């Protein structure tokens, strides 16, 4: 699989600031690792999040493992628990959440995005811990006009209490990577995303690494490894910012919009040592190739926003 050098206008930085908070007595970092442009709104996307549930490996059942959390009937579990659908109309969107929290292990799930004109809509899959100092990892698929690519907006939010100062610190870090296609140049049928949260935090698309976020706690960089997270998905309207910075609004004549989730698989492990695979030299070379040829924006080189590069940039 190759990244297509598709040119597009990047979304404004202010989009990421909506995810930042400045609560008192908190130390906050937000990592918006990837804006990744997918090729087609009709395709199915495969997610692998390396996390841990309180149960063992299994082909999970939506009836058993999740609750439809909101939407007043717009979220439905079908096919004996094997399919979950979310819908969005002008009144409301919908979403579900897992019954169990996760820390170490793996979740696989297939997601089919809103087809056709999905402008203004956001389809999500994310992990979030409880409490006022939560960690969060977000996949947000930002809809677009018919035939135009989706944009994958990936956020990391990490928080901890500040013990020696009443000041709070906020940060937003971003990268943008252009479109993925088949080696023949045709549109991809699907992409498989993987997150390893524990050794380096490695993001891959179809086994091609596109981001490595190493555990750099030794130099004062927060890393998400201590707080169990609950799994969430949602479909909602964000036409004030989601498509071309809010210039393209949701076409409600196309409602209801529908996204679907299936083939959820959950694996659990007793501790963080179960996943020990490091990037080999080939993977590291592929990562550098992607960054060189298809990275549109890299927060590590944005001196206007970060006169001094964030600490993790030295090791990523």
Predicted regions and their residues:
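GH16 jelly-roll
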Residues: 40-316
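Classical eukaryotic N-terminal signal peptides for Sec-dependent ER targeting/secretion
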Residues: 1-50, 56
